[in-house]
Amino acid sequence: MDFTTLQNDFTNDYQKALIANNEFLEAKKYYNGNQLPQDVLNIILERGQTPIIENMFKVIVNKILGYKIESISEIRLSPKQEEDRALSDLLNSLLQVFIQQENYDKSMIERDKNLLIGGLGVIQLWVSQDKDKNVEIEIKAIKPESFVIDYFSTDKNALDARRFHKMLEVSEQEALLLFGDSVIVNYSNVNHERIASVIESWYKEYNEETQSYEWNRYLWNRNTGIYKSEKKPFKNGACPFIVSKLYTDELNNYYGLFRDIKPMQDFINYAENRMGNMMGSFKAMFEEDAVVDVAEFVETMSLDNAIAKVRPNALKDHKIQFMNNQADLSALSQKAEQKRQLLRLLAGLNDESLGMAVNRQSGVAIAQRKESGLMGLQTFLKATDDMDRLIFRLAVSFICEYFTKEQVFKIVDKKLGDRYFKINSNDDNKIRPLKFDLILKSQLKTESRDEKWYNWNELLKILAPIRPDLVPSLVPLMLNDMDSPITNDVLEAIQNANALQQQNAEANAPYNQQIQALQIQKLQAEIMELQAKAHKYAEQGALSQTTNESEKINQAVAITEMQQQNANNANNEESNNKPKKKLKTSDKTTWRKYPSAQNLDY
């Protein structure tokens, strides 16, 4: 890459981005309250009036950023191969280390603010090493006004860009560390300090050896030339910048909320300052012969407490008339309120989502209007989610390429507390490249504390009769969900109660064992008693059955003998005088004819 090409490309890209950059700078001025033009401000100050600025733009931006900061985000890496599951768990832990670094939240909030106000958010990831060669991935939000994108790029995330330019201002010491003593750097004096203006350009160029595209870095100055060039600064040949555009117009210029809100904001400021002037002013018309001295009359009537002398019959003949501005004030106030409502609609919010509703409605109606009022934020949330996926994908790529040394990391887990883990100490925790999918879920926290309390109460009412053992463990979750300041105290109280219960259980363990042994012996005795009774009843049943069978046999024998005896009596009449033979039963009693009279003596 030669110096002339760098100059021409930067000039073309910068001129194309100049409109969007100027709009972004103006949006920052409006956000910080500098909304009145200088000529209007001078007129207001000459009148002795206090400038009035109703910064609805800042209210809306801060409200949306508040919703975004409080949103719930979950990032998870899912491997495409089953054998990479253990490695993916390790990479998920390293992503948590990346998220929990001190500069992460600050950079992401700055990114969200720039994206929302001006329509462009830029994040830079960089790989750094300490003196022990421990690797760390740094994150930083880049100012959009100092960042230039390839003017041919049309993608929302600039994935089709061929080059990026970042304008830097570095001190003399930083320049020496960056370029060394052998490079002549062009400095300028700013506030008695030598500052070097440097342009950092990244180009996507084709490598003939690897037959693939890679990003190369060039550090140069528009007047001096190229200070330093680096071929493929990163091992994976990636570019460290992640870009997101909120909206783009027909000329491919990015923009944010400011473009739609600015006309309404200007009218509101104009109306407020105009009404402030009209409330303290009046219009007077008088005939020349109605006053003694015109100059004195005008000067006197301009005072708050004025006593002026007029000619006789001047008031009676209505030669002096005062006109107020009440009608104009009402019309101007009504138009200003209409512009406020239109401004909220353009921002995608309503009074409920802004926390400005004063109408009396049910809780369900307010919740529904609040949810519908946040639907306008989906474009912004979708842009940030897509950008977050690209950030985490690049971070994982850097981790797989540079985390080759044995290191120990610490992450803070809400459930497990501080947790330490080691990488590259053995084959099981060795970091290596893999194919993966990123799953990112984000959800806005729209429920108020009262709504959460109501939902948790309903859930506890359902679970208490079914699973009462789960209720104590759900109480800390409920308090944590409602951001209660006593969550830690409740957790400590539950842990103390569980510890005391455990101590009592250990102290009563011998007595409980004795009681359990006695209960086992009692159960064994009861079982033996039941078995004995069952055996007794079984023997009695068998005996009764045997007796019944014997009775049947004896009855049959007796009947046979009687039939034989009757036959003998017919042949031998003398047998009538002989005593009859008694029938015997099994229990040696006289047999009776009646079935129910067996074994009975009468």
Swiss-Prot record:
Record lineage: Viruses, Duplodnaviria, Heunggongvirae, Uroviricota, Caudoviricetes
UniProt superkingdom: Viruses
Stretches of the chain forming a coiled coil according to its record: 324-352, 486-542
Region described as Disordered: 567-602
Protein name, as recorded: Portal protein
Subunit description: Homododecamer.
Entry function: Forms the portal vertex of the capsid. This portal plays critical roles in head assembly, genome packaging, neck/tail attachment, and genome ejection. The portal protein multimerizes as a single ring-shaped homododecamer arranged around a central channel.
Keywords: Capsid protein, Coiled coil, Viral capsid assembly, Viral genome ejection through host cell envelope, Viral genome packaging, Viral penetration into host cytoplasm, Viral release from host cell, Viral short tail ejection system, Virion, Virus entry into host cell
Subcellular location: Virion
BP-aspect Gene Ontology terms: symbiont genome ejection through host cell envelope, short tail mechanism
A GO CC term assigned to this protein in UniProt: viral capsid
Protein source organism: Helicobacter pylori bacteriophage KHP30
UniProt key word Coiled coil: yes
